[in-house]
Structures are given as C-alpha cells and as structure tokens.
Regions:
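A glycine-rich beta-to-alpha transition motif near the start of alpha/beta enzyme domains, typified by
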Residues: 1-109
Length: 109
C-alpha cells in the first residue's frame, strides 16, 4: 500500500486577529518570502485557498475572513509601521493586492 505523504509544511509565525468586522492572519514582512509569487503561494496555503470552505487553512470561507495583513518597521520617517493588505480569493488561486482594508489596519494599531 502506498503511503500518502503530506505536502511540505513550513512554519511561519503569525497572529490571528480580528480588526473591526474582519479577521485574518497578521504576518511580519520579514517572515514571508520576498519574491511576490512565492509570497502569494504562502498566503494561499495559509488561508486554504482555493477551496470554497478553506478547510486546509485559517481562512473562513468568506471574503471577510480571507484577508491578510503584513506589517514591517516603517521604511520612511514620520511613519510607525508599513502595512500591506492582501485580499485572498476563497475559490480561486488569486491574491489581490490592489484593495485596502481599514478594518484589518485597525488591528495593527
């Protein structure tokens, strides 16, 4: 009988936090791959996308619970932190970097 081997698992620290009406993982930028395609793959895996229920990740199967915040030390004077928001598609292997989310941002404060 063939033994099924799980995909490689990589530990990446994060905090699962609610910000306003949204919730999701908050990652430190330094803990994620610098390469955008690799970073997208990590976020898709972390949320369990693409799967309508996101059963293999920490996404909640809905756009409100498939959001990611990435935080880094400020890269410019006058700012406390750098914040990057990602909307992870629930049922497609797609990470949208164009929107913003004030709810997730409130969790950074």
């Amino acid at each position: 009988m063939d033994q099924i081997r799980p995909a490689a698992v990589r530990k990446i620290p994060c905090v699962l936090m609610r910000g306003g009406t949204s919730r999701g993982p908050y990652f430190l930028e330094r803990d994620l791959p610098a390469d955008p395609a690799a970073r997208d793959r990590v976020l898709l895996a972390a949320t369990g996308s693409p799967h309508s229920l996101q059963v293999d990740g920490i996404g909640g199967g809905h756009a409100l619970t498939s959001k990611v915040a990435i935080v880094a030390p400020a890269s410019r004077p006058g700012a406390d932190v750098d914040y990057l928001f990602a909307q992870v598609s629930v049922d497609r292997a797609f990470v949208d970097w164009s929107p913003n989310c004030g709810n997730m941002l409130s969790g950074v404060a």
